[in-house]
Amino acid sequence: MNIMKKLHIILIAAAVIFATGCNRLDVAGMVINRSDTEERVADWLDYNAQNGEPVIENAPDEYRIYSCSDSHYSERDSIVTQGANDRLYHYITTMRNDSEALFAIHAGDMVNESGEKGFVMTEEAIRYNPETQATDKPCFLVIGNHDVYFDCATFFKQHFHTSTYTVAVKTVGGHQDLYVFLDSGNGTHGTRQLDWLEEQLSNRDKYRHCFVISHNWLFRTSYNYTTTPAANLPQDEQYAFMDLMSRSNVNMVIMGHFHMREQRQFGGVQYVMTDNLNEDVETPSYLVVNVGAKVTYEYQELAEE
């Protein structure tokens, strides 16, 4: 293939990415991405080995979790951290003032451009504010594709440390629930992470309920009418992943990425796409999951103050 033909293909690909992705993108920063899934997962697992993984003790037998995604902080957005225009802050505040909520999830895409600023804003938005928040409940995060573009994975690591980990919940009634968080920032979970995931799910019988959280939505949608980098997992990986979810009796897989609400039932597993908190949408919303004898969920529109 000659140089001009290669250049033509690259330009077409870049145009497709720009047209189908989120707005305000630096296309070069998306295409030239030096962060590798396998290397990141090795870093995440090393961090876990040194620091342990979260365990929530003495939780009620029935509780709620909140899940959002795609807040896409940008220096150019009209955001005042922990202020009137900060949707992520309002989301976290709502969760921390809900007496039945246990923790929050952010399913990836915290930023929308290069640089550290968006990660700083995210960290500030989820920081406990005793003046407006009743309790200091945690927010667990995973990395999204925008969080690895522009070589931003280093900033995610500095601020949030890991994106491949588990959170175990132990209730007062003797139940245990498992939450597994994954890195799909490059449009794949990678070999090592999938092996690790299968190992975690090999103990599924110990748990009442099991949830898996990752950024990239698995299915085609009306929005996702073309293939873009990190749009969906490779097809063979998608099939293997969904087979593992079904064989392991996973209750729910929570994902984001496409800025819309969508639900699919496949192989006995409920797949749910959270809506988004992006400043560009008029009606941002998030997911509330009720966990007890059964698992139910509903979307809630964000009530801005």
PLM features per residue range, with description:
Residues 80, 207-255, 280:
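Active-site-proximal segments of metal-dependent phosphoesterases and phosphodiesterases across multiple
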Residues 18-21:
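C-terminal motif of bacterial Sec signal peptides marking the signal peptidase cleavage site
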Residues 5-12:
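Sec-dependent signal peptide recognition
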Residues 65-67, 106, 141, 212, ...:
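Residue-level marker for buried hydrophobic side chains located in beta-strands
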Residues 23-118:
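N-terminal active-site segment of His-dependent metallophosphoesterases
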Residues 70, 108-109, 144-145, 215, ...:
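Active-site glycine-centered loops adjacent to acidic/histidine catalytic or metal-binding residues
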Residues 35-53, 57, 115-209, 231, ...:
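Extended active-site neighborhood of metal-dependent phosphoesterases/phosphodiesterases
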Residues 299-305:
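Short, solvent-exposed aromatic-acidic interface loops
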